[in-house]
């Protein structure tokens, strides 16, 4: 018998911690891809419906899971922010990391494991401090310190390992839909266009939910429910967003409405594509975005997964 999906009532902290600990910044998603493929191979026997797994050179490091007769896709990006080793002891950003001097960075090059310290000069250029020089191009990420209380989870890379976690939890009971694990979101995107074209041509899918993490702000609070974004730098089609709000309200799922002028997501790539996709960002809010101290309320994680389960049935 398939196991009952626990996502609506509990947090699988072990899985979320494992996801956060995987070093896979933008451009280096292969480690996350390999983890997900092993996880899917092991767990799919417990899912209510078996998906078709689609991977290969034409999708680069992305993964598609197709369930039944899909109408809606979930996009969850696998990558994180980080740094790339430049020359001497210089670092250049991957995406927009926001870490203080003294932050521990980890990685691996041809000489072995790395655990170095982040430093900045007076012009805020980033450098590493280590006992030897590092290979050019080596990716470095925050050392993960996963902290959990009865109310909160705090860790580097909840953006977007929590979005990936959410997609995996929805997969446990999903009957009809597509889950797309995408690449490069933190560094400008680049994979969503061909993923969207594939599912549009293959299955006529043209609705998308963006399983990602947004910000706690003056209008979005911890513990008040999953965020439905009315807009960020991009503007989704209002009719589609209102349909999502209506479903959340009818089902009495706690939610918040977000209005921002900055920030973007995989939804921005969908909006700029030539395909007639409707999309909406639906995700839990976090404090301390892109720092080693990202913090999310557990109730918001639960409401996020609960809303996704309902939306994938009713959209």
Give residue spans per PLM region.
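N-terminal hydrophobic/helix-forming segments and targeting peptides
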Residues: 1-315
